[in-house]
């Protein structure tokens, strides 16, 4: 058992009764194109704002999302690591709003961040680093690491902050439920196409059996970017980046946030994104 705890990067008992944690509401309403306008505080919220009426945020196709990204890189000269840092910070901020450390049973709260091989995985690494600064205890599973300086640097940053990396992911959902209070899905983003291959097919199968909440970055992994996937993982929190993708219309979880407050006004106008007005200095906006 001690060897298993060392593998998982946690000094926590596996056996025994399950600790109380945030409940996931079943039967949440299906997401719809979000309307924003005059803002009001959400009842019972923590200072979040919600749109009341006026104009719909645009949900992007895969082609549109790729075109927006390319303009950010080429026309506006944003770098990949710059956008990754802003996106990852947005994700950690949304998570802290929905699952503040004081609402979870452990101190510090334990979070498993699962990162894929592309930019979505990079967002997850940045998110994990900021979660550590926000008072959480993140652990990272990163099975397919690209041999690129950007990703190597992100890993080093996490290691220097004493964020553990798993050599193996627990193969049983019940074990993850016992050890972690939240799972961050940073496996695949909007550029993913084709069939899910190993080891990610098995990972998604395990995630499908969890009872702890899942927070998905931009796209729930395994979903078609435009059509969604009713049989895939069903996150409790979806954090759309830049603008929601069409599959977000199939999201049935409790919380949908928009993150990535970096879109130039001219680019927003060109693609008719109709983004909501972020309040004050916030880097996230609650859509649902």
UniProtKB/Swiss-Prot annotation:
Amino-acid positions noted as binding (6S)-NADPHX in the UniProt annotation, renumbered to this chain: 119-123, 189-195, 218
Modifications made to the protein after synthesis: Undergoes physiological phosphorylation during sperm capacitation, downstream to PKA activation.
Cofactor: K(+)
Residues annotated as binding K(+): 120, 185, 221
PANTHER family reported in the protein's UniProt record: NAD(P)H-HYDRATE EPIMERASE (PTHR13232:SF11)
Subunit comment: Homodimer. Interacts with APOA1 and APOA2.
Family listed: Belongs to the NnrE/AIBP family.
Name of this protein: NAD(P)H-hydrate epimerase
């Amino acid at each position: 058992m001690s060897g298993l705890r060392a593998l998982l990067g946690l000094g926590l008992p596996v056996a025994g009764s399950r600790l109380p944690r945030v409940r996931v509401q079943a039967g949440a309403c299906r997401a719809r194109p979000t309307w924003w306008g005059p803002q009001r505080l959400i009842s019972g919220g923590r200072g979040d704002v919600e749109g009341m009426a006026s104009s719909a945020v645009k949900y992007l196709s895969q082609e549109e999302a790729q075109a927006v990204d390319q303009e950010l890189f080429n026309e506006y000269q944003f770098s990949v690591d710059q956008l990754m840092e802003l996106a990852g910070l947005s994700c950690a901020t949304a998570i802290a709003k929905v699952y503040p450390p004081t609402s979870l049973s452990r101190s510090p709260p334990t979070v498993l961040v699962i990162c894929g091989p592309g930019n979505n995985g990079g967002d997850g690494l940045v998110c994990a680093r900021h979660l550590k600064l926000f008072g959480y205890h993140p652990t990272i599973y990163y099975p397919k690491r690209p041999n690129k300086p950007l990703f190597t640097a992100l890993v080093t940053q996490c290691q220097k902050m004493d964020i553990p990396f798993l050599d193996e992911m627990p193969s049983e959902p019940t074990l993850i439920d016992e050890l972690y209070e939240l799972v961050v899905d940073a496996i695949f983003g909007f550029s993913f196409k084709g069939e899910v291959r190993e080891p990610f097919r098995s990972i998604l199968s395990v995630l499908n059996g969890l009872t702890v909440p899942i927070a998905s970055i931009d796209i729930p992994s395994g979903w078609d970017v435009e059509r969604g996937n009713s049989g895939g993982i069903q996150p409790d929190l979806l954090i759309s980046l830049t603008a929601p993708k069409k599959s977000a219309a199939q999201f049935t979880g409790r919380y949908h946030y928009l993150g990535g407050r970096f879109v130039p006004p001219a680019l927003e106008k060109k693609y008719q994104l109709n983004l909501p007005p972020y309040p004050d200095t916030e880097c996230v906006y609650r859509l649902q």
